[in-house]
């Protein structure tokens, strides 16, 4: 029996067996020596960095973004609880320190009429300072509603520092600005109450003060403030309330609800948009309420002019109306004037009420995509 022959090839031991004439492979490969110059590398964490860890964000002013070099320059607003610098915050007398934006809102005494005069950006910034989301707000009234819902509680010490009142309250303004008389004791030690100081007030101002104090009962020892006063609404406000009551709740506003131009001033933003949408007037790009009021006013005047043009059956001389005026009548109802154009064909043959019901143009039978209101020059 011949001895098996062994040789080494490709790092494997191969043995030739004389019994079966098959190659027999050894399953253990020969370990190759490491190449020269290679060295063992220690394990390293890929998430580890030799650089020092970043420090926390430095406190900065919420308004201007300047970093505070020391804690002495950092001032906290009592209303929104945010940090501001000395420039972006203010303190009136011994009162609390407030940021300029919160100070402006406190000057309005959180009255709805005054808040509606403010810009939308200021309303959003104020709500953002109080961490209130405004993503779902589409109207200015919704922002004002959120501001009124989170107005801060004003303490008794802050009530003595009432902001400047509008011109509608001259007597109250004189009462708040003048020193306290002997009938009403002062609520804080900072208010003068000595007789010598009272006698130094001019006679006219003293009479105004007595008229304002005369409405206060003797057992009521606190001064009158805007939050506790009930004022009589003016004529303009009464007209606006009456005009809003004329609209039935739950029903969309219509141009036929308006009887005079003054009724437009009493409409809300939502009602103005409903009227424009029902008459196919585009109001995109209108950011303020007065822009919507201008378009509704123009729509109202144009509608009245067209109705006056086609309403009479006789002219001024008593004769029949010329047949040429029939061209301005809607070809569907023959009652209302033509005031809309059908797209995409561009034919003007119907009024707004009939145009929104048309599926196809009555002239060319083309499919109507939409109807747009037009104004006659």
From Swiss-Prot:
Annotated positions of the Phosphoserine modification: 240, 243, 246, 254
Phenotype when the gene is knocked out: No visible phenotype.
Alphabetical list of SMART domains matching this protein: RING
Zinc finger map (RING-type): 330-365
Subcellular location: Cytoplasm, Cytosol; Cell membrane; Recycling endosome membrane
Signals that turn on the gene: Up-regulation by LPA/lysophosphatidic acid is dependent on GNA12.
Database matches in SUPFAM superfamilies: FYVE/PHD zinc finger, RING/U-box, SAP domain
Post-translational modification: Autoubiquitinated.
Annotated pathway: Protein modification; protein ubiquitination
GO BP, sorted A to Z: apoptotic process; intracellular protein transport; negative regulation of extrinsic apoptotic signaling pathway via death domain receptors; negative regulation of signal transduction by p53 class mediator; negative regulation of tumor necrosis factor-mediated signaling pathway; proteasome-mediated ubiquitin-dependent protein catabolic process; protein K48-linked ubiquitination; regulation of fibroblast migration
Enzyme class: transferase
Domain SAP: 115-134, 264-278
Bias-annotated ranges (Polar residues): 190-212
Tissue-wise expression: Ubiquitous. Detected in heart, brain, spleen, lung, liver, skeletal muscle, kidney, testis, thymus, whole embryo and embryonic stem cells.
Enzyme Commission number(s): 2.3.2.27
Assembly information from the UniProt record: Interacts with CASP8 and CASP10. Interacts with RIPK1 (via protein kinase domain); involved in RIPK1 ubiquitination. Interacts with PRR5L. Interacts (via RING-type zinc finger) with p53/TP53; involved in p53/TP53 ubiquitination. Interacts (via RING-type zinc finger) with MDM2; the interaction stabilizes MDM2.
Function: E3 ubiquitin-protein ligase that regulates several biological processes through the ubiquitin-mediated proteasomal degradation of various target proteins. Mediates 'Lys-48'-linked polyubiquitination of PRR5L and its subsequent proteasomal degradation thereby indirectly regulating cell migration through the mTORC2 complex. Also ubiquitinates the caspases CASP8 and CASP10, promoting their proteasomal degradation, to negatively regulate apoptosis downstream of death domain receptors.
Domain notes: The FYVE-type zinc finger domain is required for localization to the recycling endosome membranes and the function in endocytic recycling. The RING-type zinc finger is required for the ubiquitination of target proteins.
Name of the protein: E3 ubiquitin-protein ligase rififylin
Organism: Mus musculus
